[in-house]
Amino acid sequence: VIERSMEPFFISSIDKIFVVVGFEKERILKIIECHPAEIIENPFYSQGMSASIRVALPYIKGYEGVFFQLGDRPFLDKTLIEKMVHTFQENDKDIIVPVYNKKKGHPVLIRPAPYIEEMEKVKGDMGLREIIDKYRENVLFIESQEGVLTGLDTQEDIENLKKRGYEIEKD
């Protein structure tokens, strides 16, 4: 699941990839060891996804745009990533969010500079949601596929996908 979630980024035109690891760090490092990524360790992973955002901030401050992707979204493709990059470059919006059936998904592409102070304060599993909601005028929502919503966090998530006809490989 993790490798499939990251694959669209590895094969895209993105210049630099950072991967934040915490929970099951050794297993994740083994999965991604053959890919070009800089590893950021998150000792605070038990505090939720926002801790991963906070520990990444020193690494991303100089970048024009940064994707935030979850490790449990295996149904994304390179086309979406490239579409988001192109949309980001062609618009004056600071944040690009894919949506499916009017629901916000992942990954999120953000121009970090205007939001660094607020990103330093995010807590729990809210991630960038509060920033997206607060600065809606700076957000461009783009229609996407169901994969932007489909996370595989639990065995129940996997079983639900199987019931819908998906074949799921074991890591």
Specify the residue positions occupied by each region the protein language model found.
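Conserved N-terminal catalytic core of the sugar/cofactor nucleotidyltransferase
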Residues: 2-65, 79, 121
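A generic structural signal for alpha->beta connector loops
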Residues: 14, 36, 92-93, 136-138
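Alpha-helix/helix-capping structural signal
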Residues: 23, 113-114, 147, 156
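A generic "binding-loop/recognition-motif" signal
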Residues: 24, 72, 145
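Hydrophobic residues at beta-strand termini and immediately following loops
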Residues: 40-42, 98, 142, 152
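Conserved beta-loop-beta/alpha segment of the NTase-like Rossmann-fold superfamily
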Residues: 46-112, 117
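Conserved alpha/beta core of the MobA/IspD/sugar-nucleotide pyrophosphorylase nucleotidyltransferase superfamily
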Residues: 121-171
